[in-house]
Amino acid sequence: MKLFSNYDRLVSFVSVHQAVLAEEALNQAGIAVLLIPTPRDLAISCGMCLLFSQLTQGTVFEIFAKQNILWSKYYSCQADKRVYEKLGEYKGG
């Protein structure tokens, strides 16, 4: 599915509220994201996650830290092929 081909990172959240806050913050920063239901293959978190590009990864997590957005886990992904590799977990802070 070409729609997801530009998105190679997926981040899950501790709540739907945090997912929506993250989407709004990243949209305001001009970062392209897609808020989607968490893929069944991952069965984690609140049920919502964001897809974004690896090219924006540093900025994404800087915004999360500055705005106290609580995320759960993040993955590299080929969303169109349903292939996910866990890269990290939120450690708090």
Q: Which stretches of residues belong to each language-model region?
A:
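Solvent-exposed alpha-helices and their adjacent loops that cap or buttress functional pockets
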Residues: 2-5, 42
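Short secondary-structure transition/capping segments
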Residues: 4, 46-48, 84-87
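C-terminal structural segments of small proteins and small subunits
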Residues: 58-93
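Charged, amphipathic alpha-helical interaction segments
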Residues: 24-27, 81
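Amphipathic, hydrophobic secondary-structure cores in small proteins
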Residues: 10, 14-20, 27-66, 72
